[in-house]
C-alpha cells in the first residue's frame, strides 16, 4: 500500500511544485524503513537512488528475494554499525554478512554503491547516519 501511494504521490508532487520529469527520486530510511526503501527499489525503476542507513537486511528471506528481484536504483548507500552483527540473536547476527553480500552484488551489477561502517550499535547516531546516506546519494559521486 505504501509503495502504491508513493507511485501516485510522486507524479502529483512533481506537477504541484513544477519539478522536471527527469528530477531524481530518492527513497531512504533507517532500519526497517531502510529495508522498505531497498525493497521498493526491487519493485520499480522510478527510483534514482536509495539511502539505506542500517537497513534490516537480517530479515529472513531478504537476500534471496533481492537476488531474484534485483534492486533497480542506480545509486545505493548502505551503512551498518560495527557492533550490529555482534548479537546472540542468530537471525539478527546475519545482518553483517547480508549487507556485505548485498554491497558486493550491487557493485558486480555496476551500481554506484557504498557501504559505510559506523562506530557503535544500531541505535547510535541514527539521525546523522540517515543524513549522510541521503547526502551521498544526492552528491552523485562513486
Mark where each language-model region is.
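Conserved hydrolase catalytic core segment
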Residues: 39-48
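Catalytic active-site module of serine/aspartate enzymes centered on a nucleophile-bearing elbow/loop
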Residues: 130-142
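Short helix-loop-beta connector
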Residues: 20-23
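Alpha/beta-hydrolase active-site loop
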Residues: 1-16
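Alpha-helical elements of Rossmann-like donor-binding domains used by nucleotide-donor carbohydrate transfer enzymes
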Residues: 5-8, 101, 128, 132
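Gly/Ala-rich beta-loop-alpha elbow adjacent to hydrolase catalytic centers
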Residues: 28-33, 37
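The feature captures the conserved acid-bearing segment of alpha/beta-hydrolase catalytic domains
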Residues: 56-125
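A short, hydrophobic beta-strand element of the alpha/beta-hydrolase
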Residues: 51-53
Amino acid at each position: 500500500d505504501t509503495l502504491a501511494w508513493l507511485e501516485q504521490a510522486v507524479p502529483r508532487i512533481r506537477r504541484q511544485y513544477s519539478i522536471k520529469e527527469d528530477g531524481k527520486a530518492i527513497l531512504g530510511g533507517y532500519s526497517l524503513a531502510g529495508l522498505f526503501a531497498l525493497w521498493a527499489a526491487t519493485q520499480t525503476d522510478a527510483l534514482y537512488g536509495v539511502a539505506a542507513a542500517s537497513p534490516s537486511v537480517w530479515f529472513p528471506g531478504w537476500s534471496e528475494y533481492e537476488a531474484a528481484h534485483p534492486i533497480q536504483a542506480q545509486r545505493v548507500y548502505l551503512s551498518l554499525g560495527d557492533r550490529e552483527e555482534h548479537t546472540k540473536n542468530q537471525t539478527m547476527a546475519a545482518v553483517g554478512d547480508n549487507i556485505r553480500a548485498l554491497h558486493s552484488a550491487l557493485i558486480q551489477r555496476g551500481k554506484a554503491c557504498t557501504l559505510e561502517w559506523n562506530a557503535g550499535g544500531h541505535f547510535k547516531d541514527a539521525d546523522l547516519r540517515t543524513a549522510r546516506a541521503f547526502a551521498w546519494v544526492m552528491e552523485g559521486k562513486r
